UniProtKB/Swiss-Prot annotation:
The keyword Ribonucleoprotein does not apply. It is found in: Nucleus. Testis-specific. Expressed during spermatogenesis. It holds the Pfam family Tsc35. This is Testis-expressed protein 35. InterPro entries: Tex35 (IPR027874). It comes from Mus musculus. The lineage of its organism: Eukaryota, Metazoa, Chordata, Craniata, Vertebrata.
């Protein structure tokens, strides 16, 4: 059966070879007009969608630009305020610097008299110390042993004549014994001459 079928197919192919090759294939025929129309419709729809999308994007961009402008205006205002604030801070800093300079000068001027007084006191103290050291050097012997009078140096009192206290008279006679002794002592004479005129033995015999 299979061999008979194969032979029939061969004969049919030989007979119908020309007919089969020359017949047009319906599947390969296309309607170009319809395809063009469909393509145009598709393109028109796509362009409309693209245009709509572009419009939306433009609207969004314009909105964003307006927002950016508003933000820029706000930033400019804030920047102006910041600039004014910075200028105010600079002026305040200058005022504070001037006030600090004035306070520092006042403090220096107030400290000067105290410093001068302290310096003067220090000078006086040094001078007193030098005086004490010089006195200590004077009152010390060459060997370094202090003298006996280094503590309280008392000036010598003037010696008084004991006869003045006994006989303080100023106007008296020349024959006064005390006055004679006084004058003889002051002049450096011996005191026995004053006793000669008044001696009871002057007119009598000597022993």
């Amino acid at each position: 059966m299979s061999a008979k079928n194969a032979e029939l197919k061969k004969t049919n192919l030989k007979k119908n070879y020309k007919a089969v090759c020359m017949e047009p294939k319906l599947t390969q025929i296309y309607d170009f007009k319809g395809f063009k129309q469909e393509g145009l419709l598709i393109r028109k729809g796509m362009t409309r969608e693209l245009k709509n999308e572009l419009r939306e994007v433009r609207e969004q961009l314009t909105e964003k630009m307006e927002e950016i402008k508003q933000i820029k205006d706000i930033m400019d205002k804030d920047f102006d305020k910041l600039y004014e604030f910075v200028e105010i801070m600079k002026e305040m800093q200058q005022d504070m610097d001037e006030k600090m300079d004035v306070l520092i000068n006042n403090q220096k001027n107030n400290k000067l008299p105290f410093q001068n007084q302290a310096k003067e006191q220090q000078k006086f103290w040094q001078l007193g110390k030098m005086d004490k050291s010089s006195q200590a050097m004077i009152t010390e012997e060459p060997d370094g042993v202090p003298l006996a009078c280094d503590k309280n140096v008392v000036p010598p009192k003037p010696t008084r004549n004991p006869l003045e206290s006994l006989h303080p008279c100023q106007s008296c006679c020349e024959k006064c014994l005390l006055c004679a002794l006084k004058t003889n002592r002051n002049q450096g004479r011996p005191s026995h001459h004053a006793w000669v005129p008044f001696s009871p033995l002057s007119s009598g015999a000597a022993f």
